[in-house]
Amino acid sequence: EFLDFIEENVDIVFSNKPELHILFGSKNTEVSTKKLMNIVKCGCVKLGKKGSAVFNNSQSCKIEPKIVAAKDTTGAGDMYAAGFLSAFSKTNDYIISGKIGSALAEEIIQINGAQFKKSEMEKVRSKISKFY
């Protein structure tokens, strides 16, 4: 079964609400998140405009979103994951990682496309540096 595979082989999981509901056969996000917490080291459930829930195997934390004017949501989930993984590899802190992932996703949705231009990188670096 897929859940057995995850438990035996996966440390960090990223999911959105529909994926989480399918994975556990439940529309209850809180219950499904608690089940996921029991089988992986850490991860997050992306909640779109409502932010995200990040967790380790014993605690969870809601990451509130900053409301921004979205131009293009392409790449937001990937940018969140990249920020989370980069921060987690440096800090081993799932809350800081979720905040950085969220900050990067907030920045990428304010521009067209899924990649920052060189001219935008200083603003992005400055924004995430406050979390370290």
Report residues per predicted region:
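Conserved phosphate-binding/catalytic region of the ribokinase-like
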Residues: 28-132
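Conserved beta-alpha-beta core of the PfkB/ribokinase-like small-molecule kinase fold
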Residues: 1-33, 50-51
